[in-house]
């Protein structure tokens, strides 16, 4: 995001298979139970990190897709809601193309609640997005839970208990549970469907993170580790 906003890199989209982690938000970090929540995440086999944007703790693991879209914009604040709407709509369309009854909107009782969550049947949350803006650009990030809904539930029950946040574990869903096809192919199918939707608006070109970007990421990493 920093390099895109500074004009050093073009607009960049990344869809990745992340590590196993609970990504805490700034609101979580100032909650009285934060230290206990971090310990609960680690006890469940999840690393604890501080996220760029978003309302409350969310889960990443190897059956999820981590989305990061960095966009140059001289007036990023003006486009906050339009970027949320567009990205949430894109994810819902991608999932509908696979046969999921995907909708945009908050499911009552969901974790990390938000009006731009993507759900199935208005019953279970499948994806969430957050946004960070800086001078010169914005970053829209998100997580799509393709499989392993039980892993999300298992770790967030003690984490949310420590943070004293209400939520209904039954609202944590996964795309593979909404599909009739092979779960083993679901991750690639969802990724490709998302790329196809981005491709309707952008000319996508494969790329790799250069060494300067990776070096910057290493320097910034300590800022995302819980104290």
Model-predicted segments: where are they?
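Contiguous, small/hydrophobic- and glycine-enriched helical/loop subdomains that border
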Residues: 64-108
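N-terminal low-complexity, intrinsically disordered segments
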Residues: 1-52
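Generic non-transmembrane alpha-helical segments
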Residues: 36-40, 44, 90-98, 193-201
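Short acidic-glycine loop/turn motifs at beta-strand connectors
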Residues: 18, 62, 120-123, 134-135, ...
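DPxDG-like acidic metal-binding loop motif
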Residues: 61-71, 136-137, 141
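Long, positively charged amphipathic alpha-helical accessory segments at protein N-termini or as interdomain linkers
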Residues: 98-100, 129, 136-227
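Beta-rich nucleic-acid/ligand-interaction surfaces
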Residues: 104-125
């Amino acid at each position: 995001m920093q390099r895109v906003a500074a004009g050093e890199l073009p607009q960049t989209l990344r869809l990745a298979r992340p590590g196993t982690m609970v990504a805490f938000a700034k609101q979580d970090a100032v909650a009285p139970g934060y230290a206990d929540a971090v310990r609960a995440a680690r006890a469940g086999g999840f690393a604890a990190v501080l996220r760029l944007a978003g309302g409350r703790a969310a889960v990443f693991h190897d059956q999820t897709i981590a989305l990061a879209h960095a966009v140059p914009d001289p007036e990023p604040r003006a486009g906050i809601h339009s970027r949320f709407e567009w990205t949430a709509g894109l994810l819902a369309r991608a999932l509908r193309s696979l046969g999921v009854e995907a909708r945009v909107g908050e499911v009552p009782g969901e974790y990390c609640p938000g009006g731009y969550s993507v759900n199935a049947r208005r019953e279970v949350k499948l994806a969430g997005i957050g946004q960070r803006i800086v001078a010169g650009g914005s970053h829209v990030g998100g997580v799509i839970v393709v499989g392993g809904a039980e892993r999300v539930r298992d770790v967030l029950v003690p984490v949310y208990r420590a943070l004293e946040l209400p939520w209904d574990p039954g609202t944590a869903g996964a795309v593979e549970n909404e599909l009739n096809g092979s779960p083993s192919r679901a991750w690639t199918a969802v990724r490709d469907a998302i790329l196809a939707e981005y491709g309707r608006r952008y000319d996508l070109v494969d790329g790799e993170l250069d060494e300067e970007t990776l070096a910057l990421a290493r320097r910034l990493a300590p800022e995302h580790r819980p104290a």
